[in-house]
Amino acid sequence: MSIQHFRVALIPFFAAFCLPVFAHPETLVKVKDAEDQLGARVGYIELDLNSGKILESFRPEERFPMMSTFKVLLCGAVLSRVDAGQEQLGRRIHYSQNDLVEYSPVTEKHLTDGMTVRELCSAAITMSDNTAANLLLTTIGGPKELTAFLHNMGDHVTRLDSWEPELNEAIPNDERDTTMPAAMATTLRKLLTGELLTLASRQQLIDWMEADKVAGPLLRSALPAGWFIADKSGAGERGSRGIIAALGPDGKPSRIVVIYTTGSQATMDERNRQIAEIGASLIKHW
């Protein structure tokens, strides 16, 4: 099914954390194996997209660095402002060389003409462009305002305190710029299926995530033909890696999956491989 024909239905939000955890032992064994292989903590949660029921979880209420996965939440906040008539996706933002930070593959090419809010969200999610994220953060009032937006959604766990690239420092036992797998999964589900955003904005957000171009080595590498995925990855210091995704067979998403890891000395390739293997186990035991 083409994404143009897929529309996320309005689904009432249920308190997922009041429900028991039904784990598929094989996938959780793989998650624990990934911890051993990486020498790191791994957090994992899988939610049913329609009901919000927790299907699997491992360390669901431990804090992990958000890294670039926050960019989906950021663009959700931007879209909320668009829906409220406080922002326009077509508004062009101009910036200078001084605004550029490391890893800005899209924004560095548009110093002369600037970029629209829509283009900045696309760059932030599909290419993980850091300057795009900072420019968008400025439009909503900075990291604290994103945290306030999340609090208003009912997420009192997830917090953004810093700008790119400092938010990726992943300092142990530092709650700044962190989330928990359970909180992130619930918040992502609200953004994609709840009434916080209009149908058009929900569709726009999932379109950007579906067009992600930098998450290929992770869950996408384990995806069978015909499956749908819309995702956003993140990478940080101290061996941190993460991904948030909506995925499912038959060309449409049916589950939310969140995976975070931190504290590893493994290479990026090895971190990617372990997450991909978790994805392969998830799909095998779907």
Curated annotation (Swiss-Prot):
InterPro entries: Beta-lactam/transpept-like, Beta-lactam_cat, Beta-lactam_class-A, Beta-lactam_class-A_AS. It comes from the Bacteria. TEM-type are the most prevalent beta-lactamases in enterobacteria; they hydrolyze the beta-lactam bond in susceptible beta-lactam antibiotics, thus conferring resistance to penicillins and cephalosporins such as ceftazidime. It is an enzyme of class 3 (hydrolase). GO terms for biological process: beta-lactam antibiotic catabolic process; response to antibiotic. Substrate binds at K232, S233, G234. The keyword Ubl conjugation does not apply. This is Beta-lactamase TEM-12. It comes from Klebsiella oxytoca. The active site is at S68, E166.
